[in-house]
Amino acid sequence: MTIELGIAPIGWTNDDMPELGKEVTFEQAIDEMTLAGYKGTEVGNKYPKDPKTLKHFLDLRHLKIASAWFSAFLTTKPYEETEAAFIKHRDFLHAMGAKVIVVAEQGHSVQGLLDKSVFDDKPHFTDDEWERLATGLERLGDRAREVGMQIVYHHHMGTGVQTTAEIDRLMTMTDPDKVSLLFDTGHLVLSGEDPLTIFNRYQDRIKHIHFKDVRQQQADEEHKDHLSFLAGVKNGMFTVPGDGMIDFKPIWEAIQESGYDGWIIVEAEQDPAKANPFEYALKAKKYLDATMNIPQSA
């Protein structure tokens, strides 16, 4: 079992709301990731788009790229449009040495809409849309396998694959050899799901992990005030492991027992003006080191 610990840049600068962290440079973010002791990162909106340039900056800091988000529109657009964008994304990540590609369906998604409740207004796919999603993901999985990579599907708040039932349906409808799963603690808990149930059920298909924590008060407000996903982020509903309501110890024990081999990425969308990203990166690293002693490769 080889597990590497990385951190997402979304705590430094937000992809969905670029005004959050707009003053933070790419180099500041990766410098602080390195100083905090992480071995890798996912790709953010300020990262160089040229693999050679990006690799140069990361190699200086002994950082690696674990993956990067890809927005699919398989339920609402012709498959060919998604595939063309996916191939470019795949080739970039392949050049960076990543093994998995994070994919999330954005057809009908409300995650980027400030005026839509993440619970009340989330999409519910029709049977035809489910078929299009499953078939399209398997085709993308085939394209990933052409270069020795895998797609990992990201269940996400405000999308058509958020709940346990929706995750179950997607996993049932897709070939395990073509479609793997990203396990995100924060999105599961905020949605009201049991992360241990999901992990134990799909441990053989989980190929990428996000460790995100949730603040109880802000999670309650997300429901009570019918907030959007972005409003919830601004309100501070997410934080790093050890700073919220999630008990990561049993989750870590299940991960160890499963023989998981891959990345664990610390991820917490927060306003860096309110939650200093370097301080929170250190806080998460200290908590994970003290409570889980994650073994890492050299």
UniProtKB/Swiss-Prot annotation:
Its EC number is 4.2.1.44. This is Inosose dehydratase. The lineage of its organism: Bacteria, Bacillati, Bacillota, Bacilli, Lactobacillales. GO terms for biological process: inositol catabolic process. It comes from Lacticaseibacillus casei. Belongs to the IolE/MocC family. GO terms for molecular function: manganese ion binding; myo-inosose-2 dehydratase activity. Its cofactor is glutathione; Co(2+); Mn(2+). Pathway: Polyol metabolism; myo-inositol degradation into acetyl-CoA; acetyl-CoA from myo-inositol: step 2/7.
